[in-house]
């Protein structure tokens, strides 16, 4: 499996998580929308599905891991940063085949692509704290 296929799956998953967080729509509906309306060229679709459904169904558990490392309420974290951190926390917690450095670096790249100017620093710092605690 090419790393670029997983990278594309992560990019699509972050967008789906973001959309789901804001819309509150049914998980299956959001997944269907992304699988039918987005280009899936070079995307590891199975990995996209796992990441998106995993984050959506384990949101409470993921947030319980994230919240102790925040310096503000989770509701004050931008939706983009929240989507990225939840995705990375899912990978760090449930995908032991993904090295923690890969999960963190991918999250930083997602924050650079989708977040505000300083998002990547926030994401990096938070995930470093999360990994140090494990």
Curated annotation (Swiss-Prot):
GO BP, sorted A to Z: DNA-templated transcription termination; transcription antitermination
Protein name per its UniProtKB record: Transcription antitermination protein NusB
A GO CC term attached to the entry: cytosol
Annotated Pfam families: NusB
Job of this protein: Involved in transcription antitermination. Required for transcription of ribosomal RNA (rRNA) genes. Binds specifically to the boxA antiterminator sequence of the ribosomal RNA (rrn) operons.
Keyword Metal-binding belongs to the record: no
Disulfide bonds: none
Gene field: nusB
Organism: Shewanella baltica (strain OS155 / ATCC BAA-1091)
GO molecular function: RNA binding
């Amino acid at each position: 499996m090419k790393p670029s296929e997983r990278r594309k799956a992560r990019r699509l998953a972050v967008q789906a998580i973001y959309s789901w967080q804001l819309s509150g729509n049914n998980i299956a509906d959001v997944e269907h929308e992304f699988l039918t309306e987005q280009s899936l060229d070079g995307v590891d679709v199975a990995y996209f599905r796992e990441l998106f459904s995993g984050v959506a169904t384990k949101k409470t558990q993921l947030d319980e891991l994230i919240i102790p490392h925040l310096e503000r309420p989770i509701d004050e974290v931008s939706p983009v940063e929240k989507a990225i951190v939840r995705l990375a926390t899912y990978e760090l917690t449930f995908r032991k085949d993904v090295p923690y450095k890969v999960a963190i670096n991918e999250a930083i790249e997602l924050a650079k692509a989708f977040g505000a100017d300083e998002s990547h620093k926030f994401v990096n710092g938070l995930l470093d704290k999360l990994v140090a605690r494990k």
